[in-house]
């Protein structure tokens, strides 16, 4: 690892679902007109995001309330998703150099009877639910029945996901996790090919149920080497914050830091800014998506964006001359769009280091994989087959 890197530490923030306007192929995904950031800003009469403004957010495209500064600090552009799909795993895998041409399977009418029957047989518990639903809504609807009968609540969403909810006093966590491992085994390959199985434990009484932080994701393993694998294999640190380790099924991770919220994620990111390491610190801020996007809550989403922006004041001054900060997203989830699903959008890209003498526009990126290619280029590890590094464009 005696390699001279341009930047010793790279900090990558994925603002989960913070899209910046419809992608060219949005119509194919029934997402014409989707615009996560733009619509939230309009709904609120403007967003107060002075730190993102300084970096150059409104230079990518104007966001109401976020002024265009004369000299943005960051290099800025937007990125197009090359893969088929608009889910978390597809977006994150592409960021690290994989392209998914065959989208993970989705189950808009619930899972096939034969899969549910096999899950019941293998776990010894009946299944209730088996439909697309909001996680909070389905535990309100079926939580009481679950507590009386011990049947597990299975549900899905517009994503490729099989979620299993259970009360922690009815189905102990170790049993719930074991059930999810069985579900993962059953849906790993065709004909089901589910991207993620998620344990969704909750507590409380009927009418006052609350999901706990003991969620656990069981993702498919990435089907090729990611940039994270290359970094780890070369002896660099890869610190995964939030659900990053779950998304990549722990592939290429040297240290995993769990989080309970966006703000906890920012706390953990700030902690890593104080650590002495060479490599990547990679955080996913899931609340934008899980708490506000899917629930179509533009007010809450806007509040969360402003809270995130305020926390950048803890991040920017701690960056050293040989640090690089990359802020982006994995897909859109426009809270004023129809339905409750993700939206096919461009995502913002802001790239900053204290050594920059001001930012400039970068060309629009044709794939999220340009981020992974740039990180690989910086640490001089094998680059992924997809993606073009923009490292040389950062003066």
Curated annotation (Swiss-Prot):
InterPro entries in the cross-refs: Alkaline_phosphatase_core_sf, DeoB, Metalloenzyme, Phosphopentomutase_DeoB_cap_sf
Cofactor(s) required for function per UniProt: Mn(2+)
Cofactor info, note text: Binds 2 manganese ions.
Binding site for Mn(2+) 1: 16, 330-331
Enzyme superclass (EC): isomerase
Binding-site residues for Mn(2+) 2, renumbered to this chain: 289, 294, 342
Compartments in which it is found: Cytoplasm
SUPFAM superfamilies for this protein: Alkaline phosphatase-like, DeoB insert domain-like
Coiled coil residues, start to end: none
Alphabetic keyword roster: Cytoplasm, Isomerase, Manganese, Metal-binding
Biological process terms in GO annotation: 2-deoxyribose 1-phosphate catabolic process; 5-phosphoribose 1-diphosphate biosynthetic process; metabolic compound salvage; nucleotide metabolic process
Domain of life assignment: Bacteria
One GO CC term, this protein: cytosol
EC number: 5.4.2.7
Pathway(s) served: Carbohydrate degradation; 2-deoxy-D-ribose 1-phosphate degradation; D-glyceraldehyde 3-phosphate and acetaldehyde from 2-deoxy-alpha-D-ribose 1-phosphate: step 1/2
MF terms in GO: magnesium ion binding; manganese ion binding; phosphopentomutase activity
Pfam families: Metalloenzyme
Function in brief: Isomerase that catalyzes the conversion of deoxy-ribose 1-phosphate (dRib-1-P) and ribose 1-phosphate (Rib-1-P) to deoxy-ribose 5-phosphate (dRib-5-P) and ribose 5-phosphate (Rib-5-P), respectively.
Similarity annotation: Belongs to the phosphopentomutase family.
PANTHER family, A to Z: PHOSPHOPENTOMUTASE
Record protein name field: Phosphopentomutase
Originating species: Geobacillus kaustophilus (strain HTA426)
């Amino acid at each position: 690892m005696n390699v001279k890197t341009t930047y010793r530490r790279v900090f990558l923030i994925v603002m989960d679902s913070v899209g910046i306007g419809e992608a060219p192929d949005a119509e194919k995904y029934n997402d014409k007109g989707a615009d996560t950031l733009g619509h939230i800003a309009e709904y609120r009469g403007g967003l107060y995001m002075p730190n993102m403004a300084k970096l150059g957010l409104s230079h990518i495209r104007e966001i109401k309330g976020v002024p265009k500064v004369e000299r943005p600090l960051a290099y800025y552009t937007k990125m197009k998703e090359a893969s088929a799909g608009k889910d978390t795993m597809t977006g994150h895998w592409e960021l690290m150099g994989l392209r998914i041409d065959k989208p993970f399977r989705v189950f808009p009418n619930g899972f096939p009877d034969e899969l549910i029957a096999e899950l019941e047989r293998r776990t010894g518990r009946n299944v209730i639910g088996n439909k697309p639903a909001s996680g909070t809504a389905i535990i309100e609807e079926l939580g009481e029945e679950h507590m009386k009968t011990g049947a597990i609540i299975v549900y899905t969403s517009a994503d490729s996901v099989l979620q299993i909810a259970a009360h922690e006093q009815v189905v102990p966590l170790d049993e719930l996790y074991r059930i999810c491992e069985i579900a993962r085994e059953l849906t790993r390959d065709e004909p089901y090919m589910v991207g993620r199985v998620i344990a969704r434990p909750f507590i409380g009484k009927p009418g006052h149920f609350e999901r706990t932080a003991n969620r656990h994701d069981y993702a498919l393993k990435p089907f090729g080497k990611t940039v994270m694998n290359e970094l780890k294999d070369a002896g660099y640190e890869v610190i995964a914050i939030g659900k990053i380790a779950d998304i990549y099924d722990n592939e290429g991770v040297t240290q995993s830091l769990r989080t309970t919220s966006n703000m906890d994620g920012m706390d953990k990111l700030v902690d890593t800014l104080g650590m002495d390491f060479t490599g990547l610190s990679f955080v996913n801020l899931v609340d934008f998506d899980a708490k506000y996007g899917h629930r179509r809550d533009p007010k809450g989403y806007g509040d969360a964006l402003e809270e995130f922006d305020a926390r950048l004041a803890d991040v920017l001054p701690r960056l050293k001359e040989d640090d690089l900060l990359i802020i982006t997203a994995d897909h859109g989830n426009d809270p004023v769009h129809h339905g409750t699903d993700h939206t096919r959008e461009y995502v913002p890209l802001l790239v900053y280091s204290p050594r920059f003498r001001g930012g400039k526009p970068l060309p629009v990126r044709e794939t999220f994989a340009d981020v992974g290619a740039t990180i690989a280029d910086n640490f001089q590890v094998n680059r992924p087959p997809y993606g073009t590094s923009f490292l040389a464009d950062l003066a």
